[in-house]
Swiss-Prot record:
The lineage of its organism: Bacteria, Pseudomonadati, Pseudomonadota, Gammaproteobacteria, Pasteurellales. The keyword Hydrolase applies. This is Putative esterase HI_1161. PANTHER family: 1,4-DIHYDROXY-2-NAPHTHOYL-COA THIOESTERASE 1. It comes from Haemophilus influenzae (strain ATCC 51907 / DSM 11121 / KW20 / Rd). InterPro entries: HotDog_dom_sf, PAAI_dom, Thioestr_dom. Its EC number is 3.1.2.-. GO terms for molecular function: 1,4-dihydroxy-2-naphthoyl-CoA thioesterase activity. One of its GO terms (cellular component) is cytosol.
Length: 138
C-alpha cells in the first residue's frame, strides 16, 4: 500500500475542519491502495457569477486532495508543499457535486507529481490537473 501514515476518513476530515477546505464544503470521501478522493458541492460557495463551477475552486480542490495524498505517503516528520499546479477545465458544471481523485505519477525522494481528475456526478471528466509537490521536513 502507498500510504505510510495511519488515517481514517473521519480524522482526515477533522484535520481539514475550520479551514478553506471545510468552507468550500470539501470532504475526503474514499481511498484505495494508490488513490484518494474528495467530493465538493457545486453551490453558492463554489460557483462563479455566471452560474458554473469556478475554475479556481476546482484547482483548490485538486491541490487539497493532491497535497493530502502526498503527505500521507511520507513517513512521520515529513510533509509536502506545492511547487506547481495546472488545470484544464473540460466542461462546465452547474449543479450537484464533483469528485476529485488523486493518483501518483511519480513519488521521488524530494519531488512528487500527482494526477488529479475531477468528475461530475454523471462520471463525466470536467477538469484534469497535475500537481508538483516538494517534500520537506517538519
Amino acid at each position: 500500500m502507498l500510504w505510510k501514515k495511519t488515517f481514517t476518513l473521519e480524522n482526515l476530515n477533522q484535520l481539514c475542519s475550520n479551514s478553506a477546505v471545510s468552507h468550500l464544503g470539501i470532504e475526503i470521501s474514499a481511498f484505495g491502495e494508490d488513490w484518494i478522493e474528495a467530493t465538493m458541492p457545486v453551490d453558492h460557495r463554489t460557483m462563479q457569477p455566471f452560474g458554473v463551477l469556478h475554475g479556481g475552486v476546482s484547482v483548490a480542490l485538486a491541490e487539497t486532495i493532491g497535497s493530502l495524498a502526498g503527505s500521507l505517503c511520507l513517513e512521520e516528520g515529513k510533509t509536502v508543499v506545492g511547487l506547481d499546479i495546472n488545470a484544464n477545465h473540460l466542461r462546465p458544471v452547474r449543479s450537484g457535486k464533483v469528485t476529485a481523485r488523486a493518483t501518483p505519477i511519480n513519488l521521488g525522494r524530494n519531488i512528487q507529481v500527482w494526477q488529479i481528475d475531477i468528475r461530475t456526478e454523471e462520471n463525466k471528466l470536467c477538469c484534469v490537473s497535475r500537481l508538483t509537490l516538494s517534500v520537506i521536513n517538519l
